[in-house]
């Protein structure tokens, strides 16, 4: 499997056994100025949802592109 990974945001081969791509988004102290933080990567299972964190998982190559920002 290949997934986009941060910080490079380039497709990379996932380690053996990690067949899920994920996009995790959350707000930090700069959220109102910069927007949500994003983390992209590979996992063996979809990460557990935590309060205030959005998670999207998928299982095809490069299915987790960096979220598109709305122009201001």
Swiss-Prot record:
Location(s), subcellular: Secreted
Q: Which UniProt keywords apply?
A: Acetylcholine receptor inhibiting toxin, Disulfide bond, Ion channel impairing toxin, Neurotoxin, Postsynaptic neurotoxin, Secreted, Toxin
* GO (cellular component) term, any one: extracellular region
Disulphide bond pairs: 3-21, 14-42, 27-31, 46-57, 58-63
- Description of post-translational modifications: Neurotoxin 4.7.3 differs from 4.9.3 only in that Trp-26 has undergone partial photooxidation.
Organism domain of life: Eukaryota
**Which GO terms fall under molecular function for this chain's record?**
acetylcholine receptor inhibitor activity; ion channel regulator activity; toxin activity
Tissue specificity, in the record's words, reads:
Expressed by the venom gland.
| Pfam families named among the record's database cross-references | Toxin_cobra-type
Record-linked InterPro entries: Snake_3FTx (IPR003571), Snake_toxin-like_sf (IPR045860), Snake_toxin_con_site (IPR018354), Toxin_cobra-type (IPR054131)
Q: Which family does it belong to?
A: Belongs to the three-finger toxin family. Long-chain subfamily. Type II alpha-neurotoxin sub-subfamily.
Purpose:
Binds with high affinity to muscular (alpha-1/CHRNA1) and neuronal (alpha-7/CHRNA7) nicotinic acetylcholine receptor (nAChR) and inhibits acetylcholine from binding to the receptor, thereby impairing neuromuscular and neuronal transmission.
Name assigned to this protein = Alpha-elapitoxin-Dv2b
According to its UniProt entry, this protein's organism is Dendroaspis viridis
């Amino acid at each position: 499997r290949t997934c986009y990974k941060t910080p490079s945001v380039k497709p990379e081969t996932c380690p053996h056994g990690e067949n899920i791509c994920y996009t995790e988004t959350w707000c930090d102290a700069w959220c109102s100025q910069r927007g949500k933080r994003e983390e992209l990567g590979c996992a063996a299972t979809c990460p557990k949802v935590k309060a205030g964190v959005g998670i999207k998982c998928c299982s095809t190559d490069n299915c987790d592109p960096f979220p598109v920002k709305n122009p201001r």
